[in-house]
Amino acid sequence: MLLVALFAAVAWAAVAPGTYTPTADSFDSANAPGSSHLASGSPSCTVNADRSIDCSAYVLGGVGHTNATMDLAANYSATIDCFNKGTNKNNPVESHTSDFAADSTATVASTKNGQLRVPAQSVSPFSAPQVCPNPNWTPQIRAGSLTLNSFTYTLTFAGFSSPYITIAA
């Protein structure tokens, strides 16, 4: 019984606003060109009060001419209220709980002198498309119902199958 209660508590854990930085396991040197290192800045991701996520810019050195792909993926859940454009615009005609994702991916090209200038990356739950059963209805995330369930930020070098940098919560 205790195990079931503990599992349920973990399943409902939400990612709180705050800044998330690399841990000891965030960098995997086996998945990078030989002398890759942070030249300036440091990767971090900030979860804002509205549950949008902003990840910082930084520069990697020692990458040679190796490009990379960065990805920021967030998983959300919320109650979606569907409104009819007709007579009562203040009351939803239908509501449902929805799980959805917001994702941003970019390819970063290495510059001269073996440097990789990694730009800032962001996602927002409000940019993810919401749907209603009737295409004539307008979907809206119900205030106070939005939960950020998890997010993962990765940077993966071309020619490598796994990320060099991972920040997850």
Language model features: what each stretch is:
Residues 14-169:
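Mature extracytoplasmic or otherwise solvent-exposed domains
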